[in-house]
Amino acid sequence: ENLSNSYTGNNEPNSAIASSKVSLDLINSAYLENRNNFSMGRKAAKICLSISKGYQKINDYNQSNTYTDQAITLLDEITKDNLPLEEDQYLYASANLQMGITLGFQDKYTESREYLEYAIDQFNQLVTAIPENRNYQFYLAKALGKDAEIAFKTGAEDAVTINDYSIELLNDLINNNPRDIFKFEIAQRFYTFSKTLVSQGEDSAARTQANLALKNLKEIRKNQPSNIEFQINTAQLFRLLTELHKKAGDTEKVIEYCREALSLSETLLETDRNVEDNNSIKLEHRSRLARDYGLLGWNLVKLKDQYEIDEARKSFKESQKIYKEILIKEPSNIDAQQGYQWASDCLVELFKSSS
């Protein structure tokens, strides 16, 4: 189990999964020898959830669901003829939250909300019974937030109410103990609501929510500047703010946020390598960097200043170069094909306009 945690911390999900499976086999063997050894059964359920999260991290959602199901089956067996302990209730709630999140990634929204609502009910019971346990309150807020994300996607009427309740719980947690994990979660809630407001044409309100998200992300990145997840989320927020300020006609802010997103993309390209594949560069970071260079170029062109035009040309060339690198590795990558063609077309138009 300690080895699995080490692999997880080192960003080696496949190694973490393999190590956890070895532990699971050993614990399952002990549990099968004595079905009344519920302590072993609970340990097995915990490891199943850990494996499920590992598979979710590498986007193998079917395997993730399989191990969450296995955890729930173990818990059903443990509590069949016994009142569930607090630990059992927590594991049940965690399993339902995990399943709800994974089903959401698979666009199975109805099923996702069913599991998330089970988790919300179970965490709510734990919070009511043990209000001093801030961990339970956090996971209740997280389950509500994930439910709100699905509700926003499906246009459910209760989306804003659920999201607001999640934010209320998180604000209470932050006021008592401003931990980074609480601030990161509340930033997610503001970001989700901001995207929904954009889709509804409420750009001013969307900017307000996006700036609240950015405020929290900036605070936690001061404490953990090398945290990959914080960097990825901050970069996507800069991209959203770029689009929002573009609509508002605030060119200065557009360029500022373009540069911020690009800077983080360059950092991620170097720091978030695929440790399990000879420390290779991850394709998603190449793609984002190529897009960010292209968007910076596009927005600089609109300024129509010669200095900015020269920088725009360099940005398009860099975007084109990175897309070409992607296509060397994946010739059939449609996004890269389209991105390369777009950057090439932009360079042609720049050449024509300067002739």
Predicted segments, located by residue:
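TPR-repeat structural position
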Residues: 13, 20, 61, 68, ...
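Terminal, low-structured helical/coil segments at or just beyond the last alpha-helical repeat
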Residues: 325-355
